From Swiss-Prot:
This is Putative uncharacterized protein DDB_G0290989. Residues 169-179 have a biased composition (Pro residues). Residues 231-240, 298-312, 336-391, 399-423, 721-734, 788-808, 839-854, 942-987, 1019-1059, 1082-1105 have a biased composition (Low complexity). Residues 687-699, 772-784, 856-874, 1064-1081 have a biased composition (Basic and acidic residues). One of its GO terms (biological process) is positive regulation of transcription by RNA polymerase II. GO terms for cellular component: mediator complex.
Length: 1153
């Protein structure tokens, strides 16, 4: 750290500001490709004191401490105030090629007091371009050097010869006075002196550039140079004390030896120029003075002065940078100490040969000096062969006591470098390797810094200091303008600094402060949480643009400008992103997967922007064990690297295979999608063809209507055969039973809700159809005319009350489709009411020869009359309910539903509907949701119905169905089989593959009531049923029964048509009705008893929140019927789906948490 006394105390003045601009613009190197000019200086304080304007873009970096740029126009003045005590000056240049007004700002110096700087048009409207800058930033080091030399800036520069970071502090200039335009030269001598100084500076800069251009671009030798410096530094420390004893012996030969070693050093430079910049300058001066025949004693004095200056500068070197270098050197030294002992001994013997060869090349040296020089070097070599101490001292802090030792060390340095480079075949990647490679190759990619290390008990401290340096690793924080503003105002969890730690953390409170000499920032984290701990694991090679440890925003400059032109004030542009495509290819070729600390999963740009960093599996609480694990992993790092070198080839192969597989999968998916689209198109074409065929059939049916009517009239007159009479009686019995079933449902449509809400059919719930909402079927013939080769069965709950029969005279039936029993899951559907609208389709698999006999003249007549009665409904389909004008209100939901039906062509009339498997094209529940649905928190005991009652009722129904079917004629044996199959064990066959014409595949795959996977109902235990259905459900029958309790008087057409041949059938129906009414009364009593016994058990379930859906249904006859469906909100969620003709309520069961 720099002491307060040694820090430059510069008070900025207007003249200093002007002078700095002029000196930068007067630099020698000029580039025509860039039209950039210096604009102004910024004075910056701490981050908390920084206020960012709204229309600015932030540029972040550590090598260039960059401020938000301010867009300035002509005749505009901007005053920037930073109240912090610690401030620094930054200057920038304006790039005219970038139309957004991008301003890159560089750190200049540190100030002790705050300062207000006025920016005027004089500084903006500068026609001369800024010299020393180029697109690829090759002359950026020149710019920084000029700042250091002219403005006494405390900047870090990278010495390419030794690959070390050096703090160069030239002698400070006299402090400018605070008032502007006071120091102005009046005499011509002063002006001439100033011009001479400028010329000298320009010459020195040109020499440095020429020397830098001749340097080779070496990446693999970075770590070797560090090791060699460390070894030589240790040797110097051991040999200093012994060298002091030899000073008297060497005094008379010092001058000649200085010349020898300098020439040997020059000879090594011709082979591989890696001298520091100061030594290169001294060597150039030495060559000039030799040509002028100057004495070597003056050269010695000049060299001593330069060494003293270097020692002073090394004192001011940043302590933090020293610690970093020491850690790196210690780590490298431990790994290579044993391997380099033998090569070092061989290398130390080589300097004996060079001094012998040098005097022959130099005519100035005398042959008498050679035998004296040899024993001195032998003694020094013996001293250097002693074991080196573990502690390594920085080469910049060494006190060079003797020039002979320094020269010998230089020779040893060069020899060691050559031998080590020849002996070492493997590249070891250490912290900071990428930065060294980038800087040694003059890459414009500047690091943003990373955390150095954390002590073991650092998490126990309240404040953890994390140092960001420019020679460790990378950290990229992608933020927006709003997040920066929030961070500066609130200091809350805005950024996620997980990249710093090698693990994912969340910083809750932090502050960022610059160090005393502004060479680094200190990130003080007050609160943080370790979300995840990362462990070392090899990962596949990835390009630098996608690697999580390296900057992710690597764009070409052209692309960056195009993107930034549309997003002024919102984007954040980094100076690191200005990289060419060629340099990007070089970076991609580096082995980035061998970094010391790694993140197992790659982070995309979206993850960085959104902060989605919780992608790893294991979690951590920030205990000290984590840091112990890190130390153990660092010990095993050498073994890791060796293993990874062998695995890299395999990993590359695996990576290529993975890419090929991924590409093949993508192609397969594309092919599959195309095939699906083709199939869908074919299906649509087939459907269109079927519709056209149906329309043609309807037209043919209408043309043949008159012929059929004439035939039926003739058949009515022919009653000669007794067989026809028997068939008529049998058919009448079946038809009356069918009418009776339909009319039973017509008697009270509420019963189907009660039956479906309960846990009926011994644990199986039938997905029933409330056809009251949609269909009107007056007779079997009308129904069979509507459905082609199909009939639908009903699952209804009926009541023998006269009130229900009178009120529901306009509603005829509800239908339910039946298909395979295999498709029915247990707990199929519980407690929710819904409707299924069946469309035409299907086939009769159980047709008998008796079916032709079942078609009587009366049936044909009735089918004719039904056709004429429903001519308006022929062209409509059964695919959806037409929804008209929903009325939202605070009252229960009311909707008006109009029904439509179709009358496709009939090929033959099936004898038994249960043998049919109709195809379902759509279903829907389409009530209107109110804006504020009414919730019923409690229900009375009368509103509850026991599950056991429903089960008992259905069991009784199953028994009645079997007995009644057995009482039918023997020629209907197939009907008995079908009935037994359907109601055996109270398991009806139900079509569960319902699909809607408007629904998508995603809806069918979800947990909507569209398939086999239907949710379980809480009503098994809750038993929430509407109170209107409490008594009505007690007298129930199901399909396939000959129950006559629901016959209406509206079937006069049917009775009148059968007046000749169906009198006996009506008598039988009345008798059967009386018997069934008796059985229903008995069942009523049993059910009432069960209700009384179980009502007490239902008291605990009365407080469930229930959403009541109310429907207002309109049948084809114009009768309105209201119905309410209760749904438990605690277990179900209701949503609506807009569809053609209305919308649909989708009820989903909530998952148990």
């Amino acid at each position: 750290m720099m002491d307060n006394q040694s820090k430059p105390s510069i008070i900025p003045s207007y003249e200093w500001y002007e002078r700095s601009i002029n000196r930068v613009e007067d630099s020698s190197s000029s580039i025509n490709n860039v039209s950039s000019k210096l604009v102004f200086f910024f004075i910056i304080g701490e981050m908390k004191d920084l206020k960012i304007p709204q229309n600015t873009r932030l540029l972040l970096s550590t090598k260039h401490y960059i401020l938000p740029m301010i867009h300035l126009e002509d005749k505009q003045k901007e005053t920037i105030n930073f109240p912090s005590k610690k401030v620094r000056i930054i200057f920038g240049y304006f790039n005219n090629s970038n139309k957004e007004g991008e301003i890159t700002l560089f750190l200049d110096t540190e100030l002790e007091k705050s300062h207000n700087l006025n920016i005027t048009n004089k500084h903006i409207n500068n026609d001369q371009p800024l010299k020393g800058l180029s697109k690829n930033f090759n002359s950026l080091s020149l710019l920084l050097q000029s700042l250091q030399r002219n403005y006494n800036a405390s900047l870090l520069t990278f010495d390419k010869s030794t690959n070390t970071t050096i703090k160069q502090l030239p002698p400070p200039l006299p402090q400018p006075q605070p008032q502007p335009h006071q120091q102005q030269p009046h005499n011509k001598k002063q002006i001439d002196d100033i011009e001479l100084k400028k010329k000298k500076e320009i010459e020195e800069i040109d020499e440095i550039e020429d020397f830098e251009s001749t340097q080779p671009l070496v990446v693999d030798e970075v770590d070797d140079n560090y090791d060699d410096i460390d070894n030589n530094n240790n040797n110097n420390n051991n040999s200093n004390n012994d060298d002091d004893k030899l000073e008297d012996i060497e005094e008379h030969n010092e001058e000649e030896e200085d010349q020898i070693h300098l020439f040997t050093h020059a000879h090594s430079l011709t082979q591989k120029p890696q001298l520091p910049k100061k030594q290169q300058q001294s060597f150039d001066e030495f060559q000039r003075k030799i040509k002028d025949n100057k004495s070597p004693q003056k050269l010695k004095l000049q060299q001593q002065q330069q060494q003293q200056q270097q020692q002073k500068q090394s004192k001011h070197f940043d302590a933090f940078e020293e610690e970093l270098l020491e850690q790196q050197k210690i780590h490298e030294h431990k790994l290579q100490q044993q391997q380099q002992i033998k090569p070092q001994k061989q290398q130390l013997q080589q300097p004996q040969q060079q001094p012998q060869q040098q005097p022959q090349q130099q005519p100035q040296q005398q042959p008498q000096q050679q035998p004296q020089q040899q024993p001195q070097q032998q003694q020094k070599q013996q001293q250097k062969q002693q074991p080196t101490p573990k502690k390594i001292i920085n080469s910049l802090q060494l006190n060079n006591v003797n020039n002979n030792n320094n020269n010998n060390n230089n020779n040893n340095n060069n020899n060691n470098n050559n031998n080590n480079n020849n002996n070492k075949n493997k590249k070891e990647i250490m912290p900071g390797w990428l930065e060294k490679a980038i800087l040694s190759n003059s890459f414009p990619l500047n690091p943003c810094g990373q955390i150095v290390s954390l002590p073991e008990d650092s998490h126990k401290k309240k404040n953890i200091s994390l140092y960001l340096s420019d020679n460790i690793c990378y950290i990229q924080i992608i933020v927006s303008e709003n997040t920066v503003r929030e961070a500066l105002e609130n200091k809350k969890n805005v950024f996620n600094f997980g990249f710093l730690f090698g693990c994912v953390i969340e910083i809750l409170d932090y502050t960022i402060k610059p160090d005393q000499d502004f060479s680094k920032f200190v990130l003080n984290i007050n609160k943080f949480v370790i979300l995840n701990k990362n462990k070392h694991s090899p990962i596949s090679p990835t390009p630098i643009s996608k690697h999580p440890r390296v900057i992710s925003l690597l764009r070409i400059k052209k692309d960056m400008n195009k993107n930034a032109s549309n997003n002024i004030g919102n984007n954040i542009i980094y100076s690191e992103s200005l990289i060419s495509s060629d340099q990007l290819e070089i970076l991609n070729s580096l082995e980035l997967w061998n970094l010391p600390t790694q993140i197992t999963k790659q982070l995309s740009l979206q993850d960085l922007t959104e902060g989605n960093l919780s992608m790893l599996d294991s979690t951590n609480d920030g205990s000290s064990q984590e840091y112990e694990e890190e130390e153990e992993e660092e010990k095993n790092q050498k073994n890791f690297e060796k293993e990874e070198e062998g695995e890299n080839i395999q990993m590359r192969q695996l990576y290529e295979k993975y890419r090929e597989e991924h590409q093949s999968q993508v192609k397969k998916q594309q092919i599959i999608q195309k095939l699906k689209q083709q199939q869908q198109q074919q299906q649509q074409q087939q459907q269109e063809k079927e519709k056209q065929q149906q329309e043609k059939q309807q037209d043919e049916e209408m043309s043949d209507f008159e012929n059929i009517q004439n035939l039926m009239e003739e058949v009515q007159k022919s009653d000669d055969n007794n067989n026809n009479n028997d068939n008529n009686n049998n058919n009448n019995n079946n038809q009356t039973s069918k009418r009776k079933r339909l009319n039973e449902f017509e008697s009270d449509p509420d019963d189907i809700y009660d039956l479906l809400e309960s846990n009926t059919f011994a644990g199986h719930q039938v997905k029933g159809v409330d056809e009251n909402k949609k269909l009107r079927v007056d007779s079997e013939d009308q129904q069979t005319k509507k459905l082609t080769t199909t009939t639908t069965t009903t699952t209804t709950t009926t009541n023998t009350n006269n009130n229900n029969n009178n009120n529901n005279s306009g509603i005829d039936s509800g239908t339910k489709t039946i298909e395979d029993d295999n498709q029915l899951d247990e707990d199929f559907f519980d407690g929710l009411n819904y409707s299924i609208i069946a469309s035409s389709g299907g086939s009769n698999n159980n047709n008998n020869n008796d079916q032709n006999d079942s078609i009587t003249t009366k049936e044909k007549e009735r089918s004719e009359t039904i056709k004429t009665h429903n001519e308006d409904e022929k062209k409509n389909s059964l695919s959806f309910i037409k929804f008209e004008n929903p009325i939202p209100s605070n009252n229960p939901i009311t909707t008006t539903v109009t029904t439509t039906s179709a009358s496709p062509k009939i090929t033959e009339i099936p004898k038994q509907p249960y043998a049919i498997k109709p195809s379902i094209s759509s279903y829907s529940i389409r009530p209107t949701l109110p804006t504020k649905p009414s919730l019923i928190k409690s229900l009375n005991n009368n509103n509850n119905n026991n599950n056991n009652n429903n089960i008992n009722n259905i069991n009784n129904i199953g028994n009645k169905n079997t007995t009644v079917n057995n009482s039918n004629h023997s020629n209907h044996s197939n009907n008995n089989i079908n009935n037994n199959n359907i109601f055996k064990n109270s398991n009806p066959i139900v079509d569960t593959n319902f699909s809607s014409t408007t629904k998508t595949d995603e809806a069918q795959q979800s947990k909507i009531f569209t398939g086999n996977q239907l949710p379980k109902s809480p009503i098994n235990n809750e038993n929430v049923v509407n109170n209107n259905n409490n008594n009505e459900i007690n007298n129930t029958t199901t399909t396939t029964t000959n129950n006559n309790s629901g016959i209406h008087k509206n079937n006069n057409n049917y009775n009148s048509d059968n007046s000749d041949n169906s009198d006996d059938g009506l008598k039988q129906e009345k008798e059967e009705q009386k018997e069934e009414q008796k059985e229903n009364k008995n069942n009523n009593n049993n059910n009432n008893n069960n209700n009384n016994n179980n009502n007490n058990n239902n008291n605990n379930n009365n407080n469930n929140e229930v959403l009541n859906f109310s429907f207002s249904l309109t049948s084809s006859s114009g009768t309105n019927v209201k119905k309410t469906i209760p749904i438990l909100l605690a277990d179900y969620s209701c949503t609506s789906v807009i569809q053609e003709g209305g919308f649909e309520i989708i009820v989903k069961r909530k998952e148990n948490k």
